[in-house]
């Protein structure tokens, strides 16, 4: 197990948080020089999805051999609870299924993700496809009818605009 402490600054507030993830470095040298990747927390098995579940990827162990993974959920870190109402993007806004505007939470999470990337010098992120925050190629159309459309989630779009390489779980093989 590996304990991480990170500090990020957002609107003059300092946020400290810790994450515990299992690391299996090949040797001590690699342990300290592995490239860091910010990854959707649900992909490493954290129960942060809107319904309280996760989307653990079977390729996480392979990624851990090559990268130091920094789990992060922009929706939770942006202030939304788990579980929570499902949300979908409508233009620049994000609305949940009971018609509440949760846009501010999504943009706050995106800014925190970028601050972590800056602080830790992270150049790549792996995000959950179809998510209103993390989708990198496909999102839902905002009608809650499960209709998929080309588009990006708030965090994916924000990070890409800031020069961070954005991948989805479908792209993990290209990183191995």
Question: Can you describe what each PLM-predicted range is?
Answer:
Residues 8, 24-26:
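Polybasic, lysine-rich low-complexity intrinsically disordered segments
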Residues 34-37:
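Extreme N-terminal starter segment of soluble prokaryotic enzymes
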Residues 42, 128-131, 171:
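Short, well-ordered beta-to-alpha junction loops that form the rim of enzyme active sites
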Residues 55-96:
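Short, surface-exposed acidic-centric catalytic microdomains
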Residues 57-69, 109-124:
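Short amphipathic alpha-helices and their capping/turn segments at secondary-structure boundaries
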Residues 77, 87-112, 116, 147-176:
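Divalent-metal-activated hydrolytic enzyme cores
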């Amino acid at each position: 197990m590996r304990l991480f402490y990170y500090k990020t600054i957002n609107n003059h507030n300092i946020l400290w948080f810790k994450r515990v993830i299992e690391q299996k470095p090949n040797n001590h040298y690699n342990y300290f020089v592995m490239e860091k990747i910010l990854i959707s927390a649900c992909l490493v098995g954290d129960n942060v999805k809107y319904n309280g579940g996760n989307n653990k990827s079977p390729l996480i162990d392979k990624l851990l051999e090559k990268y130091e993974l920094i789990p992060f959920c922009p929706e939770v870190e942006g202030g939304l609870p788990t579980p929570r109402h499902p949300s979908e993007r409508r233009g620049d806004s994000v609305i949940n299924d009971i018609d509440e505007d949760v846009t501010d939470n999504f943009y706050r999470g995106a800014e925190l993700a970028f601050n972590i990337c800056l602080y830790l010098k992270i150049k790549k992120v792996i995000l959950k496809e179809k998510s209103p925050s993390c989708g990198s190629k496909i999102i839902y159309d905002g009608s809650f009818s499960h209709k998929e459309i080309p588009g990006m989630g708030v965090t994916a779009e924000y990070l890409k605009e800031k020069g961070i390489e954005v991948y989805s779980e479908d792209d993990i093989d290209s990183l191995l």
